[in-house]
From Swiss-Prot:
Record-level GO cellular component terms: box H/ACA snoRNP complex; nucleolus; sno(s)RNA-containing ribonucleoprotein complex
Family: Belongs to the eukaryotic ribosomal protein eL8 family.
Positions of post-translational Phosphoserine modification: S15
Summary of the knockout phenotype: RNAi-mediated knockdown in female germline cells results in a cyst differentiation defect that prevents progression from the 8-cell cyst stage and oocyte differentiation.
Protein name: H/ACA ribonucleoprotein complex subunit 2
Organism encoding this protein: Drosophila melanogaster
Entry-linked PANTHER family: RIBOSOMAL PROTEIN L7AE FAMILY MEMBER
Domain of life, per lineage: Eukaryota
Cellular location(s): Nucleus, Nucleolus
InterPro entries, per database record: eL8/uL1-like (IPR050257), Ribosomal_eL30-like_sf (IPR029064), Ribosomal_eL8/eL30/eS12/Gad45 (IPR004038), Ribosomal_eL8/Nhp2 (IPR018492)
GO MF assignments: box H/ACA snoRNA binding
Amino acid sequence: MGKVKVERSEDADESVVASGDVTIKEEESYDDKLIFVNAIAKPMAGKKLAKKCYKLVKKAMKHKTFLRNGLKDVQTRLRKGETGICIFAGDVTPVDIMCHLPAVCEEKGIPYTYTPSRADLGAAMGVKRGTVALLVRQNEEYKDLYDEVKEELSALNIPV
């Protein structure tokens, strides 16, 4: 199942349930989002780990310099030596724009993971637009959650 979004629409299709003039469209499940994931999106965060990552992003968003988003910003921050946790979107096309970032993270010893949807990463930040890459730095206010996510990411098998 999932969350239910309410949209105003004239016509309805199979995935939309109509009730009067308001149609209710159900959000895609985690498994449905995995269909659109690229071949290089490994290690993929499980459902629970993805939820923890989104929660961490929400907490980091409250502090201005502790969350870096966007391909260009994350790329420059990694090159300049910032550390933290990298979260990448798995449904990016074309793949060539970000396929080098996992190698950079491995060189620098930064844990990283992929989540199924870039729209969900954007929603966790509180914006309507999706994002391709995030770099979350450690802060005292969410240290426990940060350490928990970092420990789970280091337990994931990084493909060679």
